[in-house]
Design a protein with these regions (language model features):
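Catalytic domains of carbohydrate-active enzymes that cleave complex glycans
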Residues: 556-722
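Aromatic-lined carbohydrate-recognition surfaces of secreted/lumenal glycan-active proteins
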Residues: 408-436, 496-505, 538-539
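Cellulosome-associated attachment modules in secreted, modular CAZymes
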Residues: 4-104, 128
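Substrate-binding cleft/loops of secretory-pathway carbohydrate-active enzymes
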Residues: 428-457, 511-517, 545-552
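Feature activates predominantly on carbohydrate-active enzymes
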Residues: 134-137, 141, 180-372, 377-405, ...
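Active-site neighborhood of glycoside hydrolase catalytic domains
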Residues: 387-427, 440-446, 452-456, 479, ...
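Structured mid-domain segments that build the active-site/substrate or prosthetic-cofactor binding neighborhood
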Residues: 337-347, 358, 362, 469-586, ...
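Acidic, contiguous N-terminal accessory segments
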Residues: 103-186, 230-239
Length: 722
């Protein structure tokens, strides 16, 4: 049994705080085995010794956990393990002789123990280089996992150990640099050295991939998990080269507010530029995507152009058509769009873009070649499109998407003239309208951000929603698929990129989360692997009461490695449930399956527009609420720490909030189970108070309610909103 000393962890956390800021994620450790207890009955005895011998003899029925029985940590059950086991039982030795204060008992690279290694960075490396940053991360996490203290040495001739983890900074303009690109890496194990090669981000990504092999799971903003294992080996002769398929990978939500950069965002290999505080951090290769404004920029640029411009980004008054607009009209989401065919409107937008770039430069920020972009995109509405004669005429053949993409094309041509010092700066334009334009095609330096707002109920390529009523875009998923394939083809023919904006979360009722976890793999696989998009934006978050952080984790894993199989994906899902919810994770997986089935497959719905009564099968919940609740309660009984208990109790609130809404008429109003209803209801309200949970978007602006009224549409997920 491992005996990790608290003081060592405190020291490790302090070191990280000094190196990377004031925050470090808490280490959550697996307690997966006890040395010698091969039958896992809680004691080490003669039966365990017998099981080891029986396993070696190939006897049927032998029970022998390899981690528990591999005393010498050679990766197998052997005669030496049997010998050591006998010695422990006789008192000549002790199982503590084969234990460690750390989660990884033995780490080998090229056949050599990790304690025989140092870390080598280029002689001229500084802390601003990605190779140096990666070396620091490797040093820190290997210390946590094994206790080894790896010295960072500058230049190979200055190495302090015979073997080394050697980081190499590769120039982007050399042959290997062109092969690896901005994010790829290559590594090999040769003559007992681990050699790592990368350009701007590759050294960092390789480090995190190797640390995952060691046993780390970077699953949370606030916690890092490590599995307990006897032996990890990176073998002599091993080599690998990897380049991420997607150029833009972003999972947006409330998961990066603590130490999210160092402990979650970068280890998850996300690179989206919406993490503003890290956009210019050269240690991590800066970030990819639009600077300053995520997507909807026309309202802001109009304000910058027509208001009183100063050296900072204070709010400016905005005038449109001679009228001063209200604040709600000139923010990032005004209820209007500029004219797409007016030279005057175009010049205002370009002036606003120019002034915004100037503002960014005056802050001391820089644009990174090939990966930096600026948004040049419609405001966040779908009703304010210009209806002048010229726009209406162009709309007939190009749709609203082609109408405004052509406006962005014009800006993309002019931006090269306006900023010749930024020859690779791209402009990003979001499209809501999925019309397939007849003639308009994007310029090479335009990024199309395709908002996939079809049906959130059915897998996007299932064909299951074709006959149902259309949603806000008058489109079902099959129409979205047709448009996405066409736009992807157009973009790639033009040498432009297309990114997909995916909406998996409903923000309307936080306690009745969208029951779509088990269909995400199908959507990811189709959108990325079959349609061939170049970037993926997964908008999640809100309140993490149900499975929202699980969705974020699954998305992060898949968009970095879209070649994973469904079996690999499912294993990642189950591992996460174990890490997040604890020993009762199998109960939660069964609950998750029932939660998926409880989502009705008979209708189409759209997150943030439809309400839970259209997303759930009320009849199924009425029949299965008690069983679903029992599963969560069973998992709660096995919780071993406060984080697991909080996660499970919040999940119970979601189960009760949705379930009690469904059975309200039968149990309470009709009197068939009033006592059970009141008991569950009271417990739910207590937990809502305990964790200060907010039931819905519409309610609890100023505090947590003491009671919920399921007959009030603002609190109930079942009553239809007029």
């Amino acid at each position: 049994m491992k005996k990790l000393l608290a003081i060592l962890l405190c020291c490790a956390m302090l070191c990280t705080s000094l190196a990377f800021g004031s925050y470090a994620a808490e280490l959550k450790e697996d307690d997966g085995y006890t040395v010698g207890d091969v039958d896992k009955d809680g004691t080490v005895n003669a039966i365990d010794s017998y099981n080891i011998k029986a396993t070696l003899a190939g006897a049927a029925g032998a029970v022998c956990d390899v981690e528990s029985g591999d005393l010498d940590a050679d990766g197998q059950i052997s005669a030496m393990d049997s010998y050591y086991m006998k010695a422990c039982l006789s008192g000549a030795m002790s199982t503590s002789d084969f234990e460690s204060d750390h989660n990884v008992y033995r780490l080998l690279i090229g056949g050599y123990d990790i304690n025989e290694f140092c870390i080598v960075v280029p002689e001229d490396a500084t802390r601003e280089d990605n190779a140096h940053y990666a070396a620091e991360r490797m040093q820190y996490y290997i210390g946590l996992a094994t206790g080894a203290e790896l010295e960072i040495c500058y230049g190979d001739e200055n190495r302090t150990k015979e073997h080394a983890i050697v980081y190499n900074m590769v120039a982007l303009d050399c042959e290997l640099g062109e092969e690896l690109g901005y994010e790829g890496y290559k590594y090999d194990v040769t003559d007992g050295d681990l050699n790592i090669y990368g350009t701007a981000r590759g050294n960092m990504y390789c480090t995190y991939d190797l640390l995952e092999r060691v046993g780390f799971v970077f699953y949370s903003d606030y916690y890092t998990f490590i599995w307990e294992t006897r032996r990890v080996e990176i073998c002599e002769g091993e080599s690998e080269s990897f380049v991420p398929e997607l150029s833009f990978r972003m999972v947006a939500g409330s998961y990066f507010g603590g130490g999210g950069c160092e402990d979650h965002f970068y280890p998850q290999k996300l690179n989206g530029s919406q993490l503003y505080r890290a956009e210019d951090d050269t240690r991590t290769g800066t970030l990819t995507g639009p600077r300053f404004i995520n997507a909807h920029s026309f309202g802001y640029y109009w304000r910058m152009a027509t208001g009183t411009y100063t050296d900072d980004d204070h709010l400016y008054e905005c005038w449109q058509s001679g009228e001063q607009k209200e604040e709600s009209d000139w923010g990032s989401s005004p209820p209007w769009q500029p004219c797409a065919t007016s030279d005057d409107d175009y010049e205002k937008l370009m002036l606003g873009l120019d002034r915004t770039i100037t503002m960014i430069e005056k802050r001391g920020q820089k644009f990174t070649p090939y990966i930096s972009a600026m948004s040049f995109s419609i405001a966040d509405n779908q009703k304010g499109y210009c209806s002048c004669r010229n726009c209406t005429k162009k709309y007939r053949t190009e749709g609203y998407s082609g109408l405004y993409i052509d406006l962005t094309n014009r800006a993309a041509r002019d931006i090269k003239k306006l900023y010749p010092e930024y020859p690779t700066l791209k402009l990003m334009s979001i499209i809501y309208d999925h019309s397939i334009p007849k003639t308009v095609r994007p310029e090479e330096n335009v990024i199309i951000f395709f908002c996939g707002q079809g049906c959130n109920n059915h897998p996007i390529n299932s064909g299951l929603c074709d006959g149902n009523k259309p949603l806000i875009h008058k489109l079902h998923n099959s129409a979205v698929v047709e448009s996405l394939k066409a736009w992807t083809e157009y973009c790639h023919e033009a040498g432009a990129e297309i990114w997909f904006w995916y909406y998996p979360t409903s923000f309307l009722f936080y306690m009745s989360p969208c029951p779509n976890v088990l269909k995400l793999y199908d959507d990811f696989d189709f959108i990325i692997n079959e349609c061939g998009v170049d970037g993926f934006y997964f908008e999640c978050g809100g309140r993490n009461y149900g499975f929202e952080s699980l969705k974020a984790h699954l998305a992060s894993e898949f968009i970095y490695d879209p070649d994973m199989t469904r079996e690999e994906y499912t294993q990642i899902l189950k591992d996460y449930l174990y890490i997040y919810y604890g020993a009762g994770y199998e109960y939660i997986y069964e609950y998750l399956e029932m939660h998926h089935v409880s989502g009705t497959m008979d209708t189409c719905y759209l997150n943030n527009f439809n309400y839970p009564q259209e997303m759930y099968d009320e009849e199924y919940l009425c029949a299965n609420y008690e069983k679903m609740r029992e599963l969560v309660v069973s998992a709660i009984a096995l919780a071993k720490d406060a984080s697991e208990l909080e996660a499970l109790e919040k999940l119970l609130v979601c189960c009760d909030f949705t379930g009690l809404s469904a059975v309200h008429t039968d149990w309470y109003k009709n009197g068939n189970n009033v006592d059970g209803y009141v008991a569950n209801y009271d417990e739910m309200c207590e937990l809502i108070q305990k964790y200060e949970m907010r039931p819905s978007t519409f309610q609890n602006e100023d505090g947590t309610p003491e009671q919920l009224d399921f007959t009030d549409y603002e609190n109930s997920p079942w009553d239809q909103v007029a």
